[in-house]
């Protein structure tokens, strides 16, 4: 997946209660960027093509090439679906 697409998908859920998870090609695992207690605070596409996300207790950097799905698990009452 393209890094610009991922940042565009994540921008609407910044500061919302819920969990963002990424599914990677070739694995059955999903990686949680944040948890329900620590909402996503920011996302940006870095000049090197990697995606950087931030939350209260830190930040993450990942290569978007292997991402096949972005999931948004909204807190009850927040709306939103499973896949962005």
PLM features: residue spans?
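Structured surface patches comprising rigid loops and adjacent beta-strands/short helices at the edges
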Residues: 36-43, 59-77
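Short acidic DE-rich linear segments
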Residues: 81-84
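Acidic/polar residues in short coil/turn loops that connect beta-strands
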Residues: 25-27, 48, 55-57
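Anionic N-terminal interaction surfaces
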Residues: 1-39
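Conserved beta-hairpin
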Residues: 42-52
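Short linear proline/tyrosine/threonine-rich motifs used for host-factor recruitment
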Residues: 22, 33, 51-53, 61-63
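A generic structural signal for beta-strand entry/edge sites
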Residues: 48-50, 76-79
